[in-house]
A protein has these predicted regions:
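Cleavable N-terminal export/targeting peptides
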Residues: 1-32
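Short glycine/proline- and aromatic-enriched beta-strand/turn motifs that initiate or cap beta-hairpins
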Residues: 26-73, 206-208
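Short, aromatic- and cysteine-enriched interfacial helices/patches
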Residues: 3, 7-12, 46, 146, ...
């Protein structure tokens, strides 16, 4: 009998929690028409001969304002660093040569404007689709022995994104989850290795306001 009561109590508690979660009031975020996200970012470089290793060394910051019930405009800034170890090899330039291993790094910092279309605003689950466009600074660097060679580049940046904001409480911050693809026109290289455009896919997980 005690076991039955214990199971019943747990079942009722779970039912009450689920009912409360799915019956949240319409006002489920901290501002009526504004939005902001702070995210950790993980990316996967595509067709990048300079640094092709995935990495979690990134952050994203964005925010904006809804001009209509569903459509918003805003601004963004994010950054990411990818690394790749290059085994020892000989590099020749004319009559000179250098034999060394290298540590390649690509630092990307895009920023600009964004737009998004959101569904189910004011509820607990708010999916959206968006597009970003702007400029990107990218630093390509190679460390070898005690030296470093680098190339600083600029390019045009564009990135479609899909995501969802989840607000499990009536008021206060929520959870932001997104997936994105990005392309930038940056060109450059060091130590006879470089890039002609930067492509990435990635995910973002963070806090939504």
């Amino acid at each position: 009998m005690k076991t039955f009561k214990h199971i019943s109590f747990k079942s009722l508690a779970l039912l009450a929690l689920a009912t409360t979660f799915f019956a949240l009031p319409a006002k489920a975020q901290m501002t009526d028409n504004g939005y902001a996200n702070v995210d950790w970012q993980y990316n996967f470089p595509l067709s990048n001969a300079f640094t092709d290793r995935s990495s979690g060394w990134g952050m994203n910051f964005d925010g904006g304002y809804f001009l209509t019930d569903n459509w918003a405009i805003g601004a963004f800034l994010s950054y990411h660093t990818n690394h790749e170890y290059v085994p020892r090899r000989t590099i020749t330039a004319g009559s000179a040569s250098l034999t060394t291993d290298q540590q390649h790094s690509t630092f990307q910092l895009p920023f600009g404007l964004e737009t998004r279309y959101a569904w189910n605003r004011g509820r607990a689950f708010q999916p959206y689709a968006g597009l970003r466009a702007g400029a990107q600074y990218a630093r390509l660097s190679s460390e070898f022995n005690i030296f470093e060679n680098e190339d600083n580049t600029w390019g045009f940046y564009v990135s479609p994104e899909v995501g969802i904001n989840i607000f499990p409480w009536a008021y206060g911050p929520g959870l932001h989850i997104a997936a994105y693809y990005s392309y930038a026109t940056n060109q450059g290289g060091v130590m006879q290795c470089g890039v002609d455009g930067l492509n990435n896919v990635g995910v973002r997980i963070g806090i939504s306001f």
